[in-house]
């Protein structure tokens, strides 16, 4: 394995947002040196999983004998699962990305899982994605319900380190979006909230404004899972990670802690902008918006909502683009940039680095 890099020995959090065009691939290295992967997008030019396999995974703390503590697929659209094959190996468990927590919107139809079932007739994907969808179904058919976050069992704790998943049961999403199949598929998205100290991040996948409002309102069929990496909190709430009960609501988290980093819903497109989300935040806007998207070359690509790119959509942070410091309201992968964000957990502001070469980003934290 070689010399353990500096980043693997710190109590900071590192969030990688990879340039995969119109798709999503995010990796969180928590302050406890555990890994959470959110979505498996890729591009013709870059494989996030190959980069992670070489540079990050060997140095992570194992969770239940797995190098990646949790893999999350927000929803089963092709641009979010193009590298799903990395989770599959001949014996089923040899992949370095194999996790004891494979997490996705439910698609089981038997017994107690039936109220969680996805309507696959309404999931629309482009031709050529059939193999990835089959792998998705095969892989997740064997996972253990209920949907969970990490079960905190460590002897180590980090103050104010926590994260949660929020989602709506698929049959309720079908009621919210009873006619538009694309909105139904996007509305299934699992939302991930991460907090370390005063720094916070929300990853909402491709969730629609209507579904996001339902989550914020705590409407029927809304589920939440939450892990606080603290022994006392864990003992006081032993089932926060696997049952919906008195976990904090997403709206209360946003109101109490604010939002440092918002990964824009649905690649920042105008159709995904949520006024309810902004009204729920402390100060009514995040510090910075991240847009994971490709360069728009035709009218069918849609338009990025201009509010994300101005002081109306964020308060702004100083970011390092290559070697140049700039104040930005939003950052994007569209110009070929990968993004690395550091939460120190002890104050200050998040550090944000952009570079076309992820190896150069790695040197920032080694």
Where are each of the predicted segments found?
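Flexible, acidic/histidine-containing loops and adjacent segments that form or flank the divalent-metal
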Residues: 1-15, 20-21, 55-70, 81-226, ...
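Residue-level marker for buried hydrophobic side chains located in beta-strands
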Residues: 16, 36-38, 72, 201-203, ...
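Active-site metal-binding loops of divalent metal-dependent hydrolases
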Residues: 20, 39-43, 76, 170-173, ...
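N-terminal cofactor/phosphate-binding cores enriched in small/glycine residues
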Residues: 25, 33, 51-57
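Short, surface-exposed beta-strand/loop micro-motifs that present aromatic residues
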Residues: 26-29, 191-193
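Active-site-adjacent loop/helix micro-motif of nuclease/hydrolase catalytic cores
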Residues: 45-50, 80, 211-214, 271-275
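Metallo-beta-lactamase
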Residues: 67-79, 262-266
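Long, structured stretches of catalytic cores involved in phosphate-ester chemistry, encompassing
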Residues: 83, 98, 102-104, 108, ...
